[in-house]
Amino acid sequence: MSHRNKALVAIVAGTALLISSGAAIGQAAIADERSGKAMQTLNVDFATETGNFRGGASGTLYGLGDDGSPADAILDGAQVENSSQKPPSGTQHPSGDALALENQFFSNGGNELAVYMQDYYPDWSYNSGNRPSDSRTYVLDVPVDDPSYGTYTNGGDGVWDYEQVTEIVINKVLANTEHPDQYTFIPFNEPDGGNWYASGDNASAKIFRTFLSDWDSEYKLIQKIWQQYKNGEKPSKVKPTADHARVAGPGDCVYRQNRSSAFLSHAKSQNTLPDVFVWHELGKESLSSFRSHYESYRKLEKKYGINPIDVNITEYGELRDMSVPGQLIQWQSMFEDEKVQAETAYWNYAGNLSDNMARANSANAGWWQFKWYGDLRGAQTVKVSSDYMNKADSLQGIAAIDRTNKKATVLYGGANDANADQVKNDGSNIPVTVHLTGLDQNLFGSTVDVEVRENAFTGPDGVAATPRVVNALSDVDISSGTLDVTTTSVDRYASYQLIVTPHQDRVLSIDNAAAGRALLVEEVENTVLSGGAQTYIKTPWGDGWNYFMTSGNGDVGSFKTGSIASWTVDVPADGIYRFQVISGNTGFPGDNDVSVDGQSAGTIHFGAELAMKPAAKWLYRGSGEVLLRLKQGQHQIQLHGSSMDNTLDKFLLYQVSASDNSLDRIEYPADQFRLESGALLTYDQDGARGFASLNGGEAKLFAHAWESGYHSVKVVYTASRGDSMVLSVNGTSVTTITAESDGLQSSMVNVALSEGINKLELSGDAVSIRDITTCRDAADDSNAITLEAESLQLAGGAQTRENSASNASGYSYVTGLGKQFVTEESGAFGMGDQTRVVTLDTNNTPKIADAVRGTVTIPAGTIPAGKFNMVVRFSNDAFIGKHDYNPQIVDLGLQVRDGTANGEEVARGAFRYTYSDSNFLERAMTVETSGSALVLGNWDEPGVGAGAVSWGVGPNLDYVQFYPVMVGDVYHQSLA
């Protein structure tokens, strides 16, 4: 297809230039002495436990956009512990409705959902920054599910407007939620700043006294309504059982010592103490000052005789931190040390975990950091110390010990040249020694295995592959209880996962050319530039909250037609390689041609990136990839500029083919599984030490796929003949694997994976798994059925559109599915530059065009009966309202019905914003078909459902692909 270039061009090797990427395997890792960088040390004392792993720093603000956005695999993998979202009918943002997404959130690792109650208001600051008066009359005397409930007319009724807003919000949540006890209500957001009660830290100000009075009335009203539902006075789906509603506050934009002191004293006297104490730590300075703020707060509790209250930093970090694992680990370690919850700030759009995922279903490096952090659930944290404690942009870490699985983990990153933040390329090639003490031989035995994985920064929308093993130590003596593990950091913005286990019955190796997993990396500003392309030096400190981090603190711009970036690279082995470019643009898809040693080698197709505000243009970076066939030795890879005028940050060259001709082979050992419901790592069976024993539970793996299609999944395990386990992919049972022999063996099956992150689950009883290996098997893609949307039966408002500037296959696609919004052109002022903004009525409700619903029908017999992974290539540029800094995007809904438009719904999904209607992404759904016709559209009644997808508007469609979830039989092999 025209949008996806899979051609491979054979290139003959030239002279050599070695680009180092990782550390050596052996009994002791050695730092790269050529770097000339001073070694930094992170001290980890496993003998000093600091408490249960809290896991609260994986919170987000508006990290979820709607039910299904993000997809389950992304959400479950990230283990988002808490999230703050908007209230039902809230108009501050058009998506992120708590009720719409609660079931998905709580079924994928979520524990606590908070409601920003003031986000009921459409404007920022709320109500123009002024405390509301009594200027509206709200409709409250009808059932909560009546469409008129909560609407208003101008003119007062003797009741404070916000009191009525509170009643609306709490009633809508408690009447409809299925998880009332897991909600927290936040009545005020940044009251000390521009929202109604601004007085800085002046606790004597009259307006602050007004705030205290309003806090009391809000708190008591929330509790009153809670009791009405708990006692059954008001009808609800599920009755609350907790003694009282969880309320959080005060919600200041920074830590305020005087206001916090006065607030605690007052709230204690009035019995209105919050269940969660909330403030924000947004600036980079917070990496230095948070611990002192936290200590000051706890001293206030002691001063007033208050038992410790949970703390949630409901907004943390800047754009320079989001998607950057070496930054995120610094925040997470700080919050985990103090056992508090914390939520990444909401700087861009809802539904992408605060820029910590890529595309529609892929990981960026921020996602892998969230995933690693979430993997620590159930463990005990231990003491970690750094020479740079309370220093912004420095080496920090988290360490934990899982005694059940005999696994010790250290997450670390942020190493920086003598903390000199203005130095170009600071942080690259710094050797970091993790000094481990207190390793208990009673737990680990006399020798251990160690693996270190590297998670390198790829930009907010750049795809990050499964982190590679860059250091491995096998059968290392720990008789002294001490071990030093030194790894050279490729990038100060990378993070690292170090795992220690008892010596295992498997062969450890680093991901290098011998393993078919080599990776070569270069900053584009270090390549040879010509044709007007220029290097732009960046400072990691940036110029405020809206600064995006740049790999290597520099990038290349002015990259236009005639420009070339030339990279001389030494390829370690013959084979296929994936050339990835981290790049930003102006909000439209485009292409860059690639040549190798002067020969045309293909084209990289870049998708559009976020560009609706000046801070994001060219700087909100994604990635594009092309496959190259290269010979061992030196080559010159050239990227050619075009009219796209994109910026370039980093080049990466991934080895795709291994010596056995397997493609994109990734081995996931058992210590990388997430083990649940009784499954655990065991070390007491000879020949199976370090295997995951299922024990009636399950082993869960989050596997990366560069593209949708068939992948072989090979499971190596021990079992007795006849023992079985069930393999599920993305929540769908695929097959039962039954052992055909006794002892060590493997079973392999070809399954359909989606582009991005896939959740693989193995459940069973008497089976112990050593590892799971995935490999691309494109030959089986011939089993898929691909249907161009414009070739199908269109009805209603659905129509074909031609657009030569799009990245749709054949440059044509279908628009008009479902209903359609009434839209108007918008310029940069409304952050709708190059997009169309949905028109709102006086109640800030989107206007829906009076037109026939559009549908696309796949004729009967086209798709046989069966279970399929349905890949949808779509675009969505829906944009509702204006905001000072948040692009007001929404997800759109697509449903599939069996037989006719009135038939049974067999699939449903939320489809994210794609930056432009001409920019198409992939998202997959599982569908079970009967062989009848399939009708695609959006039949939701506008405004009736909870979330934005319920407005009845569908995305644009390029094509749909139906992959049978499994092809062929299970292939077994005895390894005994």
From Swiss-Prot:
<dbReference type="GO" id="GO:0005576">
    <property type="term" value="C:extracellular region"/>
</dbReference>
<keyword id="KW-0326">Glycosidase</keyword>
<keyword id="KW-0119">Carbohydrate metabolism</keyword>
<feature type="domain" description="CBM6">
    <location>
        <begin position="519"/>
        <end position="654"/>
    </location>
</feature>
<dbReference type="InterPro" id="IPR008979">
    <property type="entry name" value="Galactose-bd-like_sf"/>
</dbReference>
<feature type="active site" description="Proton donor">
    <location>
        <position position="190"/>
    </location>
</feature>
<feature type="signal peptide">
    <location>
        <begin position="1"/>
        <end position="28"/>
    </location>
</feature>
<keyword id="KW-0732">Signal</keyword>
<keyword id="KW-0964">Secreted</keyword>
<dbReference type="InterPro" id="IPR017853">
    <property type="entry name" value="Glycoside_hydrolase_SF"/>
</dbReference>
<keyword id="KW-0378">Hydrolase</keyword>
<comment type="function">
    <text>Hydrolase involved in the degradation of the gum arabic arabinogalactan protein (AGP) and larch AGP. Catalyzes the release of 3-O-beta-L-arabinopyranosyl-L-arabinose (beta-L-Arap-(1-&gt;3)-L-Ara) from gum arabic AGP and larch AGP. Also cleaves a small amount of beta-L-Arap-(1-&gt;3)-L-Ara from sugar beet arabinan, but wheat AGP cannot be used as a substrate. Can also release 3-O-alpha-D-galactopyranosyl-L-arabinose (alpha-D-Galp-(1-&gt;3)-L-Ara) from gum arabic AGP, with low efficiency.</text>
</comment>
<feature type="active site" description="Nucleophile">
    <location>
        <position position="315"/>
    </location>
</feature>
<protein>
    <recommendedName>
        <fullName>3-O-beta-L-arabinopyranosyl-alpha-L-arabinofuranosidase</fullName>
        <ecNumber>3.2.1.223</ecNumber>
    </recommendedName>
</protein>
<dbReference type="GO" id="GO:0016798">
    <property type="term" value="F:hydrolase activity, acting on glycosyl bonds"/>
</dbReference>
<feature type="site" description="Important for substrate specificity">
    <location>
        <position position="116"/>
    </location>
</feature>
<comment type="similarity">
    <text>Belongs to the glycosyl hydrolase 39 family.</text>
</comment>
